[in-house]
Amino acid sequence: LCGTAICSFGIYNVHDQSGITEGGALGLVLLLNHWFDIPSSLATPIIDIVCYVLAFRALGRKFLEVSAISTLSMAMFFRIWEHFPPVLPSLEDKPLLAALLGALFIGVGVGIVVKNGGSCGGDDALALFIHKVSGWRLSRAYLISDLTVLALSLTYIPFKKIFFSLITVTISSYILE
């Protein structure tokens, strides 16, 4: 629960407020929120379920059980944060700081969950699956999904902010490992 609280806090209070996006499933949640006004608390479990179905066979039942708890708690924490205004000042005019702070929250939060045998989002399940079947480093598997979503994010986020998102996803992928 601690990892999902940290991660969701950072996404809501840093990324959602500053326009810095995340890659993978987290970035896809932000895309859906922007494109269709779908709340993060709804989009998160839907995307996660799809990714978990893909990863179930390679990662096993225990991973799925821990991840189910993490996914539900991630949605729960998003729901809690959505009931309050952001507690951090807007970092929209300080994108490098937003990228670094977001990377710290996400990397630490996801790292706690992954080290305890689960994932706090579908991109974790997908990256762990890719890592297991390909032998790639976990950070590389994360970057592949992140870069795909960041490319899609160019539809609503200027390249300058995508640049800062690249900083976030690169740093967070190495922090979690």
Regions found by a protein language model. Name each.
Residues L1-E177:
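Core subunits and conserved enzymes of cellular information-processing
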